[in-house]
Amino acid sequence: MRTFWIVAVLLVGVEGNLLQFNKMIKIMTKKNAIPFYTSYGCYCGWGGRGRPKDATDRCCFVHDCCYEKLTDCSPKTARYSYSWKSGVIICGEGTPCEKQICECDRAAAVCFGANLSTYKKRYMFYPDLLCTDPSEKC
């Protein structure tokens, strides 16, 4: 189901933060978010439940929690400014929402980069129905 929503969003041409987040992931991991992070484990992609499968999946869990803490923001579509130099992502100026969304995405991209060694192909396109453990709280 997560994969369906991700593809649907991409087909309608979202130009906001999801594409910016993909670029951050590419900077930090040298991998495209699609297919490597869009439906990985129990939390990477749309929604999430259960326990994160590994450190990479935990990056997505923490990212979801970061988005949940944003009130009156549109984290999946709002655009923000950022730059990078020598592999360091720097969130730029903008509204408080834009800055917070950028920081959530930056932290997740950095987390993915720091945990590349935990990435397991067996968790790519992981079925939601296998995410049955009790969910953790943010």
UniProtKB/Swiss-Prot annotation:
Expression sites (tissue/organ): Expressed by the venom gland.
Cofactor note (record): Binds 1 Ca(2+) ion.
Keyword Secreted among UniProt keywords: yes
Active site: 63, 105
One GO MF term attached to the UniProt entry: phospholipase A2 activity
Pfam families assigned to the protein according to its UniProt record, in alphabetical order: Phospholip_A2_1 (PF00068)
GO CC entries: extracellular region
EC number from the UniProt entry: 3.1.1.4
SMART domains reported in the protein's UniProt record: PA2c
Catalytic activity from the UniProt record: a 1,2-diacyl-sn-glycero-3-phosphocholine + H2O = a 1-acyl-sn-glycero-3-phosphocholine + a fatty acid + H(+)
Family in the record: Belongs to the phospholipase A2 family. Group II subfamily.
Subunit architecture: Monomer.
Task of the protein: Snake venom phospholipase A2 (PLA2) that shows myotoxic activities. PLA2 catalyzes the calcium-dependent hydrolysis of the 2-acyl groups in 3-sn-phosphoglycerides.
Protein name as it appears in the record: Basic phospholipase A2 Cll-N6
Species annotation: Crotalus lepidus lepidus
Lineage of source species: Eukaryota, Metazoa, Chordata, Craniata, Vertebrata
